[in-house]
Every structure is written in structure tokens, then in C-alpha cells.
Amino acid sequence: MQPWRFIRITDAALRRRIHALVEQERPRTAAALGERAQEFLALKVEGILECAELLVVALGDDRDKHVFGRRTLPQMDLASVSCAIQNLWLAARAEGLGMGWVSLFEPRPLAELLGLPDGAEPVAILCLGPVPEFPDRPALELDGWATPRPLAEFVCENRWAQPQLP
């Protein structure tokens, strides 16, 4: 009952078109970042062109047919595909491969480019392959886009915002 599909991109011209869609989105995202716009634009998304494997992950068009959990939690299909991506990421890392999740794209043009059926939507572009190293901290942290926070900020006891006791 997987509501998702992994699409392996093997056509070089298609890979370039996907890269172009991401490049179209970059200035829009930069504009939304305000004072960090130029810093963001310095980040490259060349992995789409250079990675060993390029995958696009999409939610299927028939996902409403799977009713377990979706009646009360309609977002379970997104949770399911996120778990699938995370599992791939963990497996890749265990095999010594790197993976990057690109989310800078408008879903509709990418769906049209890949011939997704009505109701299906892309949720991720994944760049997978060998990497020169695995830094000891996440790239977003190393580049100053994220700051590590203690687990206690994310784990509550019995109620929201009730910090877990040590």
C-alpha cells in the first residue's frame, strides 16, 4: 500500500530540464529569504546534473484508495513517502553513498515534465551517489542555515510544551 513512486531519471536531457526547473525556483526562494538572498544564491544545485543517480519521488494518483489512517489523518501518504525517503537515505549512508533532497521546484511543471497522472504530485528530487566525505555535522549547519538544538526542545512529556524531565 505504498502511495508513492520513485522515478529514476536516466535521460541526460531530462536531467537538464529538471535542473532548469530548480534554477527557475531559486530566485523566488531567495527573494523570500530577504537579507540572506545573495548568500542563498551562492549555494549550487549542480548535484542534479552531476550525481550518479537522480530520483524523483512522487505521491501516486490513487492514494485516496488506501483508507487506513487517511480518514482521520489525510497527510499519512506524505508521512509514508517521507519514511521511504528516509529509509533510502539511511541505506545509502550505510553503503557509503551520499544523498541530497532537493525541494526547490514547483510541483506542477515537474509533474507535467515527468508525465505524472492527474492527482499525482512530486515531493522530492533526490541526488544519490558517491561523495568525497561525510562531514561530522549536517551541511545546513556547516553553512550557517541551521543551528543544532537539544533534543529536549522537541520531546515533551504528557502534553505539548511540557519539557521532558531528565
Language model features with spans:
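Short, electropositive alpha-helical surface patch
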Residues: L110-P122
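Solvent-exposed alpha-helices and their adjacent loops that cap or buttress functional pockets
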Residues: M1, G47-L49, L116-D118, T147-P148
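Small-aliphatic-rich amphipathic alpha-helix that forms the alpha element of a beta-alpha
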Residues: L55, R63-L113
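Short secondary-structure boundary segments
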Residues: L59, L104, P130
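Short hydrophobic/aromatic-enriched beta-strand-loop microsegments
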Residues: T29, A120-L126
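Short secondary-structure junction motifs
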Residues: M1-W4, A94, V123
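C-terminal helix-cap and adjacent tail motif
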Residues: I125-P166
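Glycine/small-residue-rich phosphate/adenosyl-binding loop
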Residues: M1-V81
